[in-house]
Amino acid sequence: MKRVTGIGGIFLKAQDPKALGAWYEKHLGVDVQDWGGAQFFFKDDESPREQGYTVWSLFKEDTTHFAPSTKPFMVNYRVADLHALLAALRAEGCEVDEKVQDDEYGKFGWVMDPEGNKVELWQPPTGG
């Protein structure tokens, strides 16, 4: 029997859910609904035969990958143009990590949200 077939949702604790939802809507374009969440539908019209993917992974308790956040999680969001988004976030006054990682898995950048959550932004490699 197959059990988990994908990630159905990511849930975050927030000190002020409305304000944090507004931040994600303004700066990252997340369409936050009245019920307090958003739904993402994955379909690639340009390459319908190619399959996109979402990664779920466990890190050791002492990882520094989430730093400077002290939270026990990090959310990764797919983006179309990492460098353009990072530039826009900087212009909007967001706390953007200067480091950008570019490897066979794509391009990665990071921003901190107002509650200290490190947000990973990922531009998949071509065909990913």
Give residue spans per PLM region:
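A solvent-exposed interaction/effector surface
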Residues: 45, 57-66
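Core segments of cupin and vicinal oxygen chelate
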Residues: 2-5, 11-55, 91
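Vicinal oxygen chelate
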Residues: 1-15, 35, 62-128
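Short intrinsically disordered coil segments
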Residues: 56, 73, 92-94
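Residues in well-ordered beta-strands of folded domains
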Residues: 41, 57-59, 122
